């Protein structure tokens, strides 16, 4: 299979030329490739955020994709770049620091190699920019038809560094989860609470209690809605995001500006106390 589509993620930002130079290296190796930007605005050095941004990429991109990703605070050290084939047939290239964790949860690794061959690197390799000279260059060589086995020695997929992912769980009277991501563009809060765990509570218009421990155990009483327009402008709601997880938002406004939670904060969702006459904020 010819992998002539490259999906590219990094933490270098879009304010200067860094991501364009990486693309220049890739086009120099694979001029027929198409390069799609996932994002270059991962928070600097934030491997977990980068991993979360990659989580849905395997589902959304076709099998002939090379997923090229780097958030590489260890650049120039013994942390190696790896190249992986997943069950879907896609190829992934990135540092072995956990960045590929959630993408590989979506489509597990079936073959993995350390990228050690100088033939698939941009020479001379800059120790402070493995992302360009090793990750991007290797991804381009794979897109140009280089065999995966040619990049370096095969390793057991069990050697791929994986980030821990806290699962939501049932607790007395409700479901306990945590904030995993902030939708920066709109200020919505995404949790790790999946549909199957909370489905019995999710009746359209049903009001649920949401306890946010980091905000002095603030409790919100929020309606569950299928979409934002079911509440008035500026009003809070619960909804299922496009990834099938429970999320909190404000219609046409910014949830975290009003309730400033961050990833890792605990959230407990439970059925509304019957006959409660309290407003949206209970505590």
UniProtKB/Swiss-Prot annotation:
It catalyses: chloride + S-adenosyl-L-methionine = 5'-chloro-5'-deoxyadenosine + L-methionine. It comes from the Bacteria. Its EC number is 2.5.1.94. Substrate binds at residues 11, 70-72, 128-131. GO terms for molecular function: transferase activity, transferring alkyl or aryl (other than methyl) groups. Keywords: Chloride, S-adenosyl-L-methionine, Transferase. The keyword S-adenosyl-L-methionine applies. Belongs to the SAM hydrolase / SAM-dependent halogenase family. Involved in the biosynthesis of the proteosome inhibitor salinosporamide A (SalA). Catalyzes the halogenation of S-adenosyl-L-methionine (SAM) with chloride to generate 5'-chloro-5'-deoxyadenosine (5'-CIDA) and L-methionine. It can also use bromide and iodide, producing halogenated 5'-deoxyadenosine (5'-XDA) and L-methionine, however no halogenase activity is detected in the presence of fluoride. Homotrimer. This is Adenosyl-chloride synthase. It comes from Salinispora tropica (strain ATCC BAA-916 / DSM 44818 / JCM 13857 / NBRC 105044 / CNB-440). The gene is salL.
